[in-house]
């Protein structure tokens, strides 16, 4: 292989090209690469931080949900107890009202019973007086008296 001027010229051109690239092109390429690497690193850091924040938020949400569920169950239990208490009070009030109504009804029945008894005595005494008057007014035979008495007794 001959070592001629063309090869030397190409070698010098290549060295100048490499020098030119190293001096002017390479720093901007390195700057762009470093900038991209920094952006990627920042993005990855941001993603990691976001994941951590998300996990913390999830844990906080779970804890808050547990607390809310406990409070809701306490409220429901309290409402059930209030319902039970209100029902008991209503039952007791209804029972008391029932007893009052029953006492009043018994009293009314007793009064009606006394009235009916009194009226019946009045009627019986009137009938007895009528019978006595009829017996006295009529001097009739015993057979007729017995028939009159039995007919009046049937009326009673």
UniProtKB/Swiss-Prot annotation:
Keywords: ATP synthesis, Cell membrane, CF(0), Hydrogen ion transport, Ion transport, Membrane, Transmembrane, Transmembrane helix, Transport. It comes from the Bacteria. InterPro entries: ATP_synth_B-like_membr_sf, ATP_synth_b/b'su_bac/chlpt, ATP_synth_F0_bsu_bac, ATP_synthase_B_chain. GO terms for molecular function: proton-transporting ATP synthase activity, rotational mechanism; proton-transporting ATPase activity, rotational mechanism. SUPFAM superfamilies: F1F0 ATP synthase subunit B, membrane domain. It is a single-pass membrane protein. GO terms for cellular component: plasma membrane; proton-transporting ATP synthase complex. Gene3D superfamilies: 6.10.250.1580. The keyword Membrane applies. It is found in: Cell membrane. The chain crosses the membrane at residues 12-32. Belongs to the ATPase B chain family. F(1)F(0) ATP synthase produces ATP from ADP in the presence of a proton or sodium gradient. F-type ATPases consist of two structural domains, F(1) containing the extramembraneous catalytic core and F(0) containing the membrane proton channel, linked together by a central stalk and a peripheral stalk. During catalysis, ATP synthesis in the catalytic domain of F(1) is coupled via a rotary mechanism of the central stalk subunits to proton translocation. F-type ATPases have 2 components, F(1) - the catalytic core - and F(0) - the membrane proton channel. F(1) has five subunits: alpha(3), beta(3), gamma(1), delta(1), epsilon(1). F(0) has three main subunits: a(1), b(2) and c(10-14). The alpha and beta chains form an alternating ring which encloses part of the gamma chain. F(1) is attached to F(0) by a central stalk formed by the gamma and epsilon chains, while a peripheral stalk is formed by the delta and b chains. This is ATP synthase subunit b. It comes from Buchnera aphidicola subsp. Baizongia pistaciae (strain Bp).
